[in-house]
Amino acid sequence: MKDVAQSLFVGAMTARRTVALVTVAFALSVGQGFWAQGPLTLEAIALADSGNLSEAETVLNEALSGPESADAMTWYVHAYVLKERFVEEGNQPTSPQRNKALESLRECIRKDPQDRLEDWWRPLLLFLGESLLLDVQVEIRNIAPGQPVVAEQYFMQYAEIQRDLDPEVDTAAEWVLMQQQLGETAMTEAQALEKAGAGPWFELGTHHYTLAAEKNQDQYRSLFNLAVHTYNQGVREFKTAEDDLDAIDAALENASRHWLRASEFLESAITKDDTQAEGFEALAIVSTALLNQDRIEWCKAHIQELEGH
């Protein structure tokens, strides 16, 4: 279930972009005679091309503390070397090299107002953005009650990069999809736990589906899924009292509250898209559960009368 969810997430994220990910695989020495005039930058390029990344970074740090810091190419080379170190270290999400590479790349862009280096910095920026997107996918699977939602942190960095690439870009639909997948991951855990410990996972899933439903993208799906999981939580809570007659009244009351909320979510979903038959079918099921609960309450209130007393 989780792997399928992540595949959908990746597909939706990459389908939006018209520019495909271009791996930065070209040699730094290309065009160096025209762009990189500084001797330290040239030395760093030679070191990087020979695989001596740490030495190249040391030389670049010296270059950036002097006159060569005014050269956009020097900042680009610095970003490239840091990116290579990030890859060399295994693309670790917590690696400081990625953030440092982003800082240098943004400085390169600021010093290149005519975008003469765009064909160089854009692929590198795309690569760094995609690396963050991969971390979002991993952290969706790692979500847990009471823990920071790291996926959101990585997504915010990813969204900033998309704005670097295109100031007019809107990542709201991608953000909604991430919230849906966070919600679905939590709800799947709640379902797997059944009677024992489902509550915290259900609350976490509700939180993320609610965040998704608040945005004006794919609201029907967010509300419908939230309704289905809310109904199922009511069923789970009712089942906890199956073998405990003393607790069944409270369990039924709790379940009915979930079913009522589920019906409200479904009604809202249908107002967003009344062409989906599943919405009406689910509402019929929830309404039947509420009706049966009302019948039980009526029977309890008239039990003596029904027994002929």
Task: Tell me the role of every PLM-derived stretch.
Residues A63, C108, Y158, A212, ...:
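Canonical positions in the second alpha-helix
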Residues A72, V176, G183, Y220-R221, ...:
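Helix-start (N-cap) detector for alpha-helical repeat units in TPR-like alpha-solenoids
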Residues E68-S69, P113, R163, Q217, ...:
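Short coil turns that delineate tetratricopeptide repeat
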